[in-house]
Amino acid sequence: MSLGLIGRKVGMTRLFTDEGEAIPVTVIDVSDNRVAQIKTQATNGYDAIQLAHGTRRATRVTKAMAGHFAKAGVMAGNALNEFHLDAAKIAEMTPGQVIPAETAFTAGQKVDVQGVTIGKGYAGTIKRYHFASGRASHGNSRSHNVPGSIGMAQDPGRVFPGKRMTGHLGDITRTVQNLVIARIDAERNLIMVKGAIPGAPGGKVIVTPAVKTPLKKK
């Protein structure tokens, strides 16, 4: 149970260390994370806070959501997410409170980043699963990109579940674990993590403290 933030992927750049080493980082904008609702054990059966992120006109959300934001006294957002917290931490928060980046995270901390991967549409097995293509010549006729056999004969007489075939590629939720925060820009509420994260620039991401930190090698 730890506090996370909703962010927007800005893009990638690089940072330089004092030794001159270039570090590729992804910039995440976590500004305007505001408390939209506080849930407690007494009223909801569990302890959590609901954060809103982004801005949206009240006329562009449903009446139910417009009332939900108005009750908390916050501007309508385009993203909502819950984070389970201890009752002691929730007691310190109030609806409408803005949570800055340095409150939730510190430089050098490991985090998990969840996002939706870039959709590639309907793709073949070569692009989707990195299958090898067929021969370009020497008797190969119109079978350059076919996947090959998809099963056996009359026994078992079916295609096994999970067989890798053509289909939709991308546009699924993925989480990258144990990314290190290289720097936090407190003035602009930006988090810079080492490496790449899922999604296209401008996409919604959720940043949470790492839950499965790897063991140190002896």
Curated annotation (Swiss-Prot):
InterPro entries: Ribosomal_uL3, Ribosomal_uL3_bac/org-type, Ribosomal_uL3_CS, Transl_B-barrel_sf. One of the primary rRNA binding proteins, it binds directly near the 3'-end of the 23S rRNA, where it nucleates assembly of the 50S subunit. The keyword Ribosomal protein applies. Coiled coil: none annotated. Methylated by PrmB. One of its GO terms (cellular component) is cytosolic large ribosomal subunit. Keywords: Methylation, Ribonucleoprotein, Ribosomal protein, RNA-binding, rRNA-binding. This is Large ribosomal subunit protein uL3. The modification N5-methylglutamine is found at residue 154. The gene is rplC. Residues 134-154 are annotated as: Disordered. HAMAP family: Ribosomal_uL3_B (MF_01325_B). Belongs to the universal ribosomal protein uL3 family. One of its GO terms (molecular function) is structural constituent of ribosome. PROSITE patterns: RIBOSOMAL_L3. Disulfide bonds: none annotated. One of its GO terms (biological process) is translation. Transmembrane segments: none annotated. It holds the Pfam family Ribosomal_L3. Part of the 50S ribosomal subunit. Forms a cluster with proteins L14 and L19.
